[in-house]
A protein has these predicted regions:
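Acidic/histidine-rich helix-loop elements
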Residues: 54-64, 128-130, 227-234
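Structural motif corresponding to the early beta-alpha repeats
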Residues: 80-176, 183-188, 224, 229, ...
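Acidic (Asp/Glu)-rich catalytic clusters
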Residues: 39-46, 71-76, 94-114, 140-148, ...
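Acidic/histidine-rich catalytic cores of soluble enzymes
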Residues: 46, 81-82, 172-279
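Non-membrane alpha-helical structural segments and their capping/turn regions in soluble enzymes
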Residues: 64, 68, 96, 100, ...
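N-terminal export signals
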Residues: 2-4, 10-33
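C-terminal segment of N-terminal export signals and the immediately downstream linker at the start
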Residues: 27-54, 60
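C-terminal helical cap(s) of enzyme catalytic domains, especially alpha/beta-barrels
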Residues: 301-316
Length: 318
């Protein structure tokens, strides 16, 4: 029995062949063997590699796969853990039967479920106290869903308005309230640099200090440092990504390896991954790093695998 046969049998068992995951790219090279190598190598390494669901957003929005396929997709590509996006099961947060099916799919695939990235539930830094309270309340169902799935965190946004100091005060107030709620579930509330002042590392690290709660943390993203998306092509609309990650790492409970394009040597063209991973390692982080491929030059699966291979090469000194 060769690796190709093992891989195809595994894919059939996970119900992936009908979903298009049995492409030559993924299955032709012995994906199951690649998964075993990654899992074995990752166990003793300083970080392991997970897959953020947003990497496959084009396939999900197109209906080529659905949320329940995600765990199996990640398994075939060699990932040991997954990070969900609430948009892909927005109406299922309180559906215990559905969440249990997600648990079953993840268990069958042999992947861990790490966190849920939550959007569209209101601004935790809204100037209106009542609106902030509604936003906190809206996130409760995602805390419950994350608990049901065995996740360690939900990722939220710190959107606000006003002056620098006003936004820090408002965002920290909403986050602290949510952290107090999350404490009962044993879950963390982590904030990503995700536009506006949240993409300013100094501002967001200041928010963390103001919240001053053991359940709060950051999810530094290698690429999300645009302060004004309406001026995305202008240099001064961007915060220095290396400085930003360095400022956010002391509070990190997860890390996102954003990628868009690669050169002929497999290096990401917009981010110096060696430099970025050194910042992450020097901060003392020892956990999962999530691949989030957002480019258009490669198929979503191919881009995700390319990012994973780049992380492995640097991590393993290859």
């Amino acid at each position: 029995m060769n690796e190709q046969e093992i891989t195809r049998r595994e894919a059939v068992k996970l119900g992936l062949l009908g979903a298009g995951a049995a492409s030559g790219l993924l299955l032709g090279g012995g994906a199951l063997a690649e998964t075993r190598r990654a899992d074995a190598g990752g166990a003793g390494a300083w970080f392991r590699i997970s897959l953020a669901q947003w990497s496959l957003h084009k396939l999900l929005f197109a209906g080529e796969i659905d949320n329940l396929d995600f765990a199996g997709e990640a398994r075939v590509m060699g990932f040991g853990a997954i990070e969900y996006v609430n948009a892909f099961f927005k109406d299922k947060a309180e559906d215990i039967a559905y969440l249990n099916e997600m648990n079953k799919r993840a268990s069958d695939a042999g992947v861990e479920q790490l966190l849920i990235m939550c959007d569209g539930e209101g601004n935790l830094g809204d100037p209106s106290e009542s609106a902030r309270n509604v936003a906190v309340s809206n996130h409760k169902k995602w805390l419950e869903a994350a608990k049901q799935l065995g996740c360690h965190s939900i990722r939220v946004n710190a959107a606000s308005s006003g002056t620098w100091e006003e936004q820090q005060r408002l965002a920290s107030d909403g986050l602290r309230s949510l952290c107090e709620l999350a404490e009962a579930y044993g879950l963390n509330v982590i904030v990503e640099n995700h536009g506006g002042l949240s993409s300013n590392g100094k501002w967001l690290s200041g928010v963390m200090e103001l919240v001053d709660h053991p359940r709060v943390g950051t999810l530094p993203d290698f690429g999300n440092f645009c302060l004004d998306w309406s001026r995305v092509d202008e240099a001064d609309a961007w915060y220095d990504r290396y400085r930003g990650v360095e400022e956010l790492m002391p509070f990190a409970k997860a890390v996102s390896a954003k990628s868009h394009a690669f050169d002929d040597d497999g290096n990401e063209t917009g981010t110096d991954y060696e430099r970025m991973l050194k910042i992450v390692k020097d901060a003392g982080y020892r956990g999962w790093i999530g691949v989030e491929y957002e480019g258009g030059g490669l198929d979503p699966r191919a881009g995700s695998v390319a990012t994973k291979k780049l992380l492995e090469r640097i991590r393993d000194g290859g």
